[in-house]
């Protein structure tokens, strides 16, 4: 839906979908903002674009459905399906040279074009959510209305609060996060409607409602886990006149630091989506294809994100930097860092935060965080160390010769920024990643149901049958 389509209101009337009314008034960061009635809601915008998108996909499949889009090698089958072209993901496309594009927009373009909070420099993630779902850059009023709608939907059911409170503090924050999101299935409009029987054309409507409710509740869930495990258990209420990132920062206990709030806006934006093949995105899509609710689908994605090969990399970067400082002491010379890099590699270990399955250049998400740090914390010792490693590591990794991408990815920087502002509990960081990732995977889930995407069911083969497959491919 990346193209901009302007359809008449008849398209919306012809649908059986009844859009929720736009919030008529809301205070936003201290400014009273009133809907004029002219700003289309997110649901209205998506509903208007849907008929044309359905026709586009129908035409594409009719004209090119039998065309080959790629080949699969035996190595790819055994190697995690790397590079296999078999998924449709509308929100973002990852180019190996230039990095991620959200609906065709680079990160710098999103930083420039998406609405910001008054006095802020970073984009509001509400705007990115709108962009990922519709392909359009929203107006400031539309983003304010979306902020207000999420705030209005944010109240947690009492049993969810009690469920989190009963978790032992020793239970990993991601396990608690997944547990709470799974339990929200009790509130799923999609699950209840499906049980009663609904038209397939209406699937997206209930998926949309669940996704909006779920996203709205994530900051309070995430903050409650953080405050229970690491602080005094007290969580500030959602402020209805504030944006999504402010409320998350404030509920965590850092709302009085404007720079941390800005960091959350940047963090939630750049961690939201990274194509559809990564574990959390693909898992959410896969589970959703079985018509599981957004709650169950996202919870499955969060469980994938909790894996050390996916969502724990920024924590591992911090651990590695800390060990390096302890090992080389005050001698933070280029030569000492170079030697430590080599000792890491020679021990058969990877340098965390460097390399990527797809990227072959410095991750633009790393660059955006580096630019933030240069503005806000240029003299921080850990940032200086990260910068020093950035200068040295690519050369060492290239000389080592076992990586296709010797450049830093997003994880090489994010943990250092969070540490600087006092959020030092590294085993909590993946929860923040999960809040952000919801903003990327749930738009696609809505699109999947709107386009009638089928259940995912690739074909598998055993190792014993592989030789016969190779013989057939050579004929």
Curated annotation (Swiss-Prot):
Keyword terms: Mitochondrion, Transferase, Transit peptide, Tricarboxylic acid cycle
Which Enzyme Commission number(s) are on file for it? 2.3.3.16
Localization, per the record, is: Mitochondrion matrix
Q: CDD domains from the entry? A: ScCit1-2_like
Q: What class of enzyme is it?
A: transferase
| GO cellular component terms listed in the entry, alphabetical order | mitochondrial matrix
Alphabetical list of Pfam families matching this protein: Citrate_synt (PF00285)
Q: What GO molecular-function term can you cite, just one?
A: citrate (Si)-synthase activity
Q: Ion transport: present as a keyword of the record?
A: no
Q: What is its main location?
A: mitochondrion
* Xref: InterPro entries: Citrate_synth-like_lrg_a-sub, Citrate_synth-like_sm_a-sub, Citrate_synthase, Citrate_synthase_AS, Citrate_synthase_euk, Citrate_synthase_sf
Q: Which GO terms describe its biological process?
A: carbohydrate metabolic process; citrate metabolic process; tricarboxylic acid cycle
Q: Where is the active site?
A: 310, 356, 411
Catalytic function, reaction form: oxaloacetate + acetyl-CoA + H2O = citrate + CoA + H(+)
Pathway it works in: Carbohydrate metabolism; tricarboxylic acid cycle; isocitrate from oxaloacetate: step 1/2
The UniProt record lists the keyword ATP-binding:
no
Q: What else is known?
A: Citrate synthase is found in nearly all cells capable of oxidative metabolism.
Family as reported in the entry's similarity comment: Belongs to the citrate synthase family.
Q: What is this protein called?
A: Citrate synthase, mitochondrial
């Amino acid at each position: 839906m990346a193209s901009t389509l302007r359809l008449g209101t008849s398209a919306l009337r012809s649908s059986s979908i009844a859009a929720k009314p736009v919030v008529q008034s809301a205070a936003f960061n201290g400014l009273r903002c009133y809907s004029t009635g002219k700003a289309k809601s997110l649901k209205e915008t998506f509903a208007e674009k849907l008929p044309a998108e359905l026709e586009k996909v129908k035409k594409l499949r009719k004209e090119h459905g039998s065309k080959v889009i790629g080949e699969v090698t035996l190595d790819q089958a055994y190697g995690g399906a790397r590079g296999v072209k078999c998924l449709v993901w509308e929100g973002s496309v990852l180019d190996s040279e230039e990095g991620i594009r959200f609906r065709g927009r680079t990160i710098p373009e999103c930083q420039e074009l998406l609405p910001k909070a008054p006095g802020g420099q970073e984009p509001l993630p509400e705007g990115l959510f709108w962009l990922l779902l519709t392909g359009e850059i929203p107006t400031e009023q539309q983003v304010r209305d979306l902020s207000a709608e999420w705030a209005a939907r944010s109240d947690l059911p009492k049993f969810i609060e009690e469920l989190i409170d009963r978790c032992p503090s020793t239970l990993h924050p991601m396990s608690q996060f997944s547990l709470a999101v799974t339990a929200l299935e009790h509130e799923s409009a999609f699950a209840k409607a499906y049980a009663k029987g609904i038209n397939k054309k209406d699937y997206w409507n209930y998926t949309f409602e669940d996704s909006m409710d779920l996203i709205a509740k994530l900051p309070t869930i995430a903050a409650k886990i953080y405050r229970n495990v690491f602080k005094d258990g007290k969580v500030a209420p959602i402020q209805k006149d504030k944006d999504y990132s402010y409320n998350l920062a404030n509920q965590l206990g850092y709302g009085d630091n404007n720079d941390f709030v800005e960091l959350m806006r940047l963090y939630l934006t750049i961690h939201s989506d990274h194509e559809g093949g990564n574990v959390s995105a693909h898992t959410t899509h896969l589970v959703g294809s079985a018509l599981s609710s957004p709650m169950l689908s996202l919870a499955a994605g969060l469980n994938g994100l909790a894996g050390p090969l996916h969502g724990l990399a920024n924590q591992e970067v911090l651990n590695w930097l800390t060990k390096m400082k302890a090992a080389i002491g005050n001698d933070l010379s280029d030569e000492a860092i170079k030697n430590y890099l080599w000792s890491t590699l020679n021990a058969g270990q990877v340098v965390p935060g460097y390399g990527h399955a797809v990227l072959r250049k410095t991750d633009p998400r790393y660059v955006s965080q580096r630019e933030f740090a240069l503005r806000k914390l240029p003299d921080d010792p850990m940032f200086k160390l990260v910068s020093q490693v950035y200068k040295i590591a690519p050369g060492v990794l290239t000389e080592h010769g076992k990586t296709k991408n010797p450049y830093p990815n997003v994880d090489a920087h994010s943990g250092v920024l969070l540490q600087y502002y006092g959020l030092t509990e590294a085993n909590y960081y993946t929860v923040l990643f999960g809040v952000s990732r919801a903003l990327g995977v749930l738009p696609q889930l809505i699109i999947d149901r709107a386009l009638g995407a089928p259940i995912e069911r690739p074909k598998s083969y055993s190792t014993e049958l592989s030789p016969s497959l190779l013989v057939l491919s050579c004929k």
